[in-house]
């Protein structure tokens, strides 16, 4: 049996395949090796397993984690091994999951547009080039957190239209000082800003919000995608909630910058199931 884990920034999704057929799917808590202990991860995986699922039947585990670097692969591998001792365990960053889900074993360009941003060139087996998105503070252009951060800055500085201000006031129960306190002193400021991606999406008919989303995608191209050599020769393939739900704004920007639209997926799991069925 194969077990695939797509561990995003908040909730990992697990899917078990037996002879290519989906046996079960379940969710667990988010895992950032920088902030959790080994015991916590082991206990949480065990707690998340369905009652009728026997971990001893798992032969291979493919764990793709957001923010998981090579330095942390051993930590994740050890945690999973304590729950599934007979399994061969593969650990990689979520960017490889996105490339495999979007492109399978074909070369091309792949991007993630969700709470954060990432992108790469992929040769059908491995990532060959990754222009660093630099994370929430320095970059992540085009992401939900980037849009939310810009909206909050404009709101606090009074640079939004009256119509947009009324919408924001109805959904953001904080003044400027409180927003600053949350961003600089509370955990996960990226998630705090990213939650307002839905507000922006739901109000795209208001020019301020549409222009904000459009410019965020333009900055994605200006600051990241245009740095890939000969980027216009690739199709734009993307996975993530922002890329999926903002398609009507994203597609014209992609075409304006000379790329053609390829595959757009809300989550990578469906593509990962396809990919690992061929193993």
What are the functions of these language-model segments?
Residues 1-61, 79, 83, 99-109, ...:
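ATP-binding/phosphotransfer module of carbohydrate and carboxylate kinases, centering on a glycine-rich
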């Amino acid at each position: 049996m194969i077990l695939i884990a797509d561990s995003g920034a908040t909730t990992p999704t697990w899917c078990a395949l037996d002879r290519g057929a989906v046996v079960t799917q379940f969710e667990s808590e988010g895992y950032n090796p920088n902030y959790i202990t080994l015991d916590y991860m082991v206990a949480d995986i065990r707690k998340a397993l369905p009652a009728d699922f026997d971990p001893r039947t798992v032969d291979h585990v493919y764990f793709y984690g957001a923010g998981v670097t090579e330095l942390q692969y051993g930590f994740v591998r050890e945690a999973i091994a304590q729950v599934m001792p007979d399994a061969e365990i593969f650990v990689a960053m979520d960017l490889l999951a996105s490339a495999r889900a979007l492109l399978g074993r074909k070369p091309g360009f792949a991007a993630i547009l969700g709470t954060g941003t990432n992108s790469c060139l992929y040769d059908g087996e491995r990532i060959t080039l990754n222009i660093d998105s630099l994370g929430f503070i320095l970059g992540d252009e085009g992401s939900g957190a980037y849009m939310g951060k810009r909206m909050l800055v404009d709101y606090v500085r009074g640079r939004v239209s009256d119509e947009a201000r009324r919408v924001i006031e109805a959904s953001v129960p904080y003044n400027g000082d409180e927003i600053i306190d949350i961003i600089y002193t509370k955990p996960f400021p990226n998630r705090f800003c990213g939650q307002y991606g839905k507000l922006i999406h739901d109000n795209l008919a208001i020019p301020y919000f549409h222009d904000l989303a459009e410019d965020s995608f333009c900055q994605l191209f200006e600051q990241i995608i245009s740095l890939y050599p000969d980027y216009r020769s690739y199709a734009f393939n993307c996975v993530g909630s922002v890329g999926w739900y903002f398609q009507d704004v994203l597609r014209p920007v992609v075409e304006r910058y000379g790329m053609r639209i390829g595959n757009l997926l809300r989550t990578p799991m469906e593509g990962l199931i396809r990919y690992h069925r061929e193993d």
